[in-house]
Amino acid sequence: VVGALNKDLPYDEFLRRQIAADLMDLPVREQAALGFLTLGRRYLNKHDLIIADRIDVTFRSSMGLTMQCVRCHDHKSDPLTMKDYYGLYGVFDSTEEVPNGELPVIAPPEDSPGYREFRRELIKRANAAHEYAVARIKNYQRPADPLKFDRKAALSKLNQTERGKYRGLLAKIDELEGKSEFAPARAMAVRDRIKPREPVIFERGQQSSRGPKVPRAFPAFFREEPDRTFRQGSGRLELARELTRQDNPLTARVCANRVWMHVMGRPLVSTPG
């Protein structure tokens, strides 16, 4: 955010990156903007509640619209329906967080304070351990015809349980490396699922009460084309473009109202959120 302000990044471009930087033709470091989606509340990792929060935060922050009401029923005062809500639910349900071991590196590790000294010490200790092991081996008898192990062949002999333990250890190593204070900076990013999920309406907002299917789409009242739905992957990039298109003035007006509030002490419209 600070970098975007310092570069005077246009507000519409700033918003698009917050929602869909991974789907835009941008350097990988720009995926740091996706923290807007990933760093929200977790609700004990309840998937439907995390998605509900992302919908609410996205629309309150950009268009000043509260979307929580239409999760359970059509809005009584705004032109928003449950069909609109679950069309957006499908967008975020078709999006997944990138696992820790695969998070995109947004800055070379050399930029991390103390990284070079850390690497030197790591190499020094690894070499010392290797030299110690070699010296110890010399004290034991060696067969005339040593048996050579092929790593892949050895792994293929493991049963399913052992393979699971092995993968778990590798994942733990990745996790420790990722959490190291000397690890390279990584983006808390999201990505589209391989296969988008087709949303359905949850009757009364209950995930267990599945109603009719709906298309992934922008809320109908604000659409440029009434019948247009999202067809590119999850639909996040299309959503970002709909939020920031020039003939959707609500996004710009909400931003102007908030800027006015911070500069002048009170907003032009009394409900900036």
Question: Which ranges hold each PLM region?
Answer:
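Structured DNA-binding interfaces in DNA transaction proteins
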Residues: 56-60, 67, 74-89, 239-273
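Extracytoplasmic c-type cytochrome modules immediately beyond a signal peptide or single-pass transmembrane anchor
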Residues: 1-37, 43-44, 171-174, 178-181, ...
